[in-house]
């Protein structure tokens, strides 16, 4: 116990020699004097006002979304209009017949090469056309028929432009077969598919066909005929 007290006193004496109390106190006093004193504390309400930048700020997200939506709708509308214009242009262009199509829509036939009492079959728009150079006897026979007895009443004069030339589409009005010329019970045309008989004016006289053979549009130009 005495030894511990002795050691404590020795250490205290050594510390006093190394750090004098007066100098340490004066140092601490000097350092305390340099600490500034706060006379007041600025609160949030005393702070200077911040500048207002609201007029320079972007609009709300809702306004921006609406602008983007309007822009997208406008762009899609413009693209749709352009596509529709191109489609209409292509559609109308397809209606403009080319020179080849116009040429195929007409058929020109030299009538001087068809002997009297004979038929000629030509192709027009993918269909056969019968051209008959009728004899005077055939013309007389065609005009002697009582049209009131016909299934499809039609005078011969209503079916020809010139009595000696009969021009018809060679398609049976029953189911579309091609009749045979100079055949049948009436000296005109006979359809072998279902037995329809046509006379020398191309009028239906017997069989299932409901109508006379059709007459195409045609014109005469000198010794030629233009079909179509």
Swiss-Prot record:
Ranges of residues in domain Rieske: 139-227
Which GO molecular-function terms appear in the entry? 2 iron, 2 sulfur cluster binding; metal ion binding; oxidoreductase activity; ubiquinol-cytochrome-c reductase activity
Organelle targeting peptide span: 1-26
Q: Which PROSITE patterns match?
A: RIESKE (PS51296)
Topological domain spans for side Mitochondrial intermembrane: 94-228
Cystine connections: 177-193
Residues in the Mitochondrial matrix compartment per record: 27-63
User: Where does the chain bind [2Fe-2S] cluster?
Assistant: 172, 174, 191, 194
Write down the membrane topology. Answer: Single-pass membrane protein
Q: How is the cofactor bound?
A: Binds 1 [2Fe-2S] cluster per subunit.
Naming one, the record's GO cellular component terms include: mitochondrial inner membrane
| Cofactor(s) recorded in Swiss-Prot or TrEMBL | [2Fe-2S] cluster
Q: Which Pfam families match?
A: Rieske, UCR_TM
Kindly report the protein's main subcellular placement as a broad class. Answer: mitochondrion
Classification via InterPro entries: bc1_Rieske_TM_sf, Rieske_2Fe-2S, Rieske_2Fe-2S_sf, Rieske_Fe-S_prot, Rieske_Fe-S_prot_C, Rieske_TM, Ubiquinol_cyt_c_Rdtase_Fe-S-su
Q: What is its EC number?
A: 7.1.1.8
- Bilayer-spanning residue ranges: 64-93
Protein family (similarity comment):
Belongs to the Rieske iron-sulfur protein family.
> Quaternary arrangement and interactors, per the entry?
Component of the ubiquinol-cytochrome c oxidoreductase (cytochrome b-c1 complex, complex III, CIII), a multisubunit enzyme composed of 3 respiratory subunits cytochrome b, cytochrome c1 and Rieske protein, 2 core protein subunits, and additional low-molecular weight protein subunits. The complex exists as an obligatory dimer and forms supercomplexes (SCs) in the inner mitochondrial membrane with cytochrome c oxidase (complex IV, CIV).
The role this protein plays is:
Component of the ubiquinol-cytochrome c oxidoreductase, a multisubunit transmembrane complex that is part of the mitochondrial electron transport chain which drives oxidative phosphorylation.
Something else known: The Rieske protein is a high potential 2Fe-2S protein.
- The protein here is known as Cytochrome b-c1 complex subunit Rieske, mitochondrial
Which species expresses this protein natively? Schizosaccharomyces pombe (strain 972 / ATCC 24843) (Fission yeast)
